[in-house]
Amino acid sequence: MTAMEGASGSSFGIDTILSGAGSGSPGMMNGDFRSLGEARTTDFRSQATPSPCSEIDTVGTAPSSPISVTLEPPEPHLVTDGPQHHHHLHHGQQPPPPSAPPAQSLQPSPQQQPPPQPQSAAQQLGSAAAAPRTSTSSFLIKDILGDSKPLAACAPYSTSVSSPHHTPKQECNAAHESFRPKLEQEDSKTKLDKREDSQSDIKCHGTKEEGDREITSSRESPPVRAKKPRKARTAFSDHQLNQLERSFERQKYLSVQDRMDLAAALNLTDTQVKTWYQNRRTKWKRQTAVGLELLAEAGNYSALQRMFPSPYFYHPSLLGSMDSTTAAAAAAAMYSSMYRTPPAPHPQLQRPLVPRVLIHGLGPGGQPALNPLSNPIPGTPHPR
């Protein structure tokens, strides 16, 4: 009975029941036992019903409404248990008739206050459980882990239905008020972290852009090699060009003194005259090579000899009977001699020379071979 008294919040001892029976109010006694049955059913269901806060902590979903559990009417065998127990206690006292007015049975005595209705306590519990669900609307890991700590304080509210002097609403409000600054601190921390991340992203993006610009600029502008500055071309006047051409016709190669005299006469530097002569010789050799090839193909070696006199002596009888192959060979020898430009021999040592290419028809000692030429050299005896 003492356990029942602590659970219901009102004294239901033998003395209290006897005093209630002695007052002569069977309806009051019936009401006390009905309230006792309701309290017992509420205790049993509150123990069997899981805590809404524990459901939030473990599952993370909305808890089941405790109102649907506590609003069910008490079972008939628990309600009728009160009069039977009262009958056994009073040793043969008859239970009150069932036709007693319900108003008298539900009115409590001024000395004994009945426990609060389980409906109002369940409504308070539902409102207390609904408050933390609406306070945090995000389902992030930080919010769930942060909500588990303050919501764990709501675990003892599952047994608060049996105790009338317990105030779960005030404790939940105090827990929420203590949890609000924590949420504000977490929000401020997350905002600061986001700002720092954005600033770091901007910095990294800026450095990346600068690096990309440097790479693109290095690709667009390749490394400049150390080149010597190109000299500007000299613009010669007509008078200077005419004098240089006349000098080149006389001499293809100039000595150092002749080059210095010509440069002083034309108001040019020694380097400018030297460069012009080099370019002019290259052009002349190219033109000469082309002309020799054309004349060799045509077979007109006499015109070639007139155009380019050779230091070698050729007899007219040999030139008349020369074919195109021999003329091409002679032109090649002449062209090579012009490139070499051998120095002029001493006048006393100079004598007419005949190239070996041109004496293939002559015998030893300058005598004609077995096949005489069409135009023999005058004064040469014919072979017999």
Curated annotation (Swiss-Prot):
Spell out the InterPro entries in the cross-references: HD, HD_metazoa, Homeobox_CS, Homeobox_TF, Homeodomain-like_sf
Q: Which GO terms describe its biological process?
A: amacrine cell differentiation; cell fate commitment; cell fate determination; nervous system development; neuron differentiation; neuron migration; positive regulation of transcription by RNA polymerase II; positive regulation of translation
Q: In which tissues is it expressed?
A: Expressed in the ganglion cell layer of the retina in the eye and in the ventral zone of the dorsal thalamus of the CNS.
Keyword entries, A-Z: Developmental protein, DNA-binding, Homeobox, Nucleus, Transcription, Transcription regulation
| Region described as Disordered | 1-134, 154-237, 364-384
Q: What is the annotated localization of this protein?
A: Nucleus
Which SUPFAM superfamilies does the annotation name?
Homeodomain-like (SSF46689)
Residue ranges under compositional bias (Low complexity)? 119-134
The GO molecular function terms of this record are:
DNA-binding transcription activator activity, RNA polymerase II-specific; DNA-binding transcription factor activity; DNA-binding transcription factor activity, RNA polymerase II-specific; RNA polymerase II transcription regulatory region sequence-specific DNA binding; sequence-specific double-stranded DNA binding
Keyword Nucleotidyltransferase in the entry? The reply is no
Q: Which residues bind DNA?
A: 229-288
Q: What is its main location?
A: nucleus
One GO cellular component assignment for this chain's record is:
nucleus
Feature: compositional bias, Basic and acidic residues: 177-217
Organism's domain of life? Eukaryota
Protein name as catalogued? BarH-like 2 homeobox protein
Q: What is the lineage of its organism?
A: Eukaryota, Metazoa, Chordata, Craniata, Vertebrata
